[in-house]
Regions:
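Preference for the N-terminal adenyl/adenosyl cofactor-binding alpha/beta module
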Residues: 1-215
């Protein structure tokens, strides 16, 4: 039920925050070549960014599961297969056991960056382009889609600069997608199942958010 899902998510999100923070630090030390002994990371700031990022992630899963809210264009296969978190969950299920090459790539991070960018700035960007796209969508038989800009702080890249500047490996992001996608069985007899975000209500989302703030 929804209460059980929200309780499970509270623990999953905490684990995700640790994985995400460690991956950002790994990228700083390796790819970015930052000497953290000379330029230490503000641990409190990084934790706050990870909190914002994970709530961003959770919120996208929520609005994709609720297409009636009108934010995520789930009727468009172009969006679902190319950009959506729902589609990314499917991809992760297929490649979970794949090679180290897949694990060391950045496909998941690149897809999420594009998705969050479109959500914050809208797609196409700019009001004029947006209006044109709506007309094209009406007149065309192609699987076009539009997204209105969702100018909420949790999607503002200025609030997650450390994460935005990092490149996050698939091996870390696969763990995060798994934790946010697959339920943990309460006992040995239960099977792991895919979490249904359509079962979550506003109250449960609020409870998860409060749990994040108390992290």
């Amino acid at each position: 039920n929804s209460a059980a899902v929200s309780d499970a998510l509270k623990y999953a999100l905490r684990e995700c925050i640790e994985i995400l923070g460690n991956e950002v630090i790994y990228d700083m030390k390796t790819r970015q070549g930052i000497d953290l002994s000379e330029h230490p990371v503000d641990a409190a700031e990084l934790t706050l960014e990870c909190l914002r990022y994970m709530y961003r992630f959770l919120f996208m899963l929520f609005i994709e599961a609720r297409p009636e809210l009108g934010y995520a264009p789930m009727k468009s296969q172009t969006y679902v297969q190319g950009y959506s978190l729902e589609g990314l969950r499917d991809v992760c299920e297929r490649v979970r056991e794949s090679s180290e090459v897949v694990s060391e790539g950045y496909y998941i991070d690149d897809t999420l960056k594009e998705l969050f960018h479109m959500t914050y700035y809208g797609y196409p960007e700019g009001l004029d382009d947006y209006k044109k796209a709506i007309e094209i969508e009406k007149e065309s038989m192609h699987d076009a889609f539009t997204m209105e800009a969702l100018k909420a702080h949790i999607f503002d890249p200025e609030y997650t600069k450390l994460i935005t500047n990092a490149r996050l490996r698939n091996c870390a992001m696969l763990q995060i997608v798994d934790l946010m996608s697959i339920s943990r069985p309460a006992n040995a007899k239960e099977r792991r199942g895919r979490i249904s975000y359509s079962a979550l209500g506003i109250n449960q989302m609020g409870a998860v958010y409060e749990a994040l703030l108390s992290y």
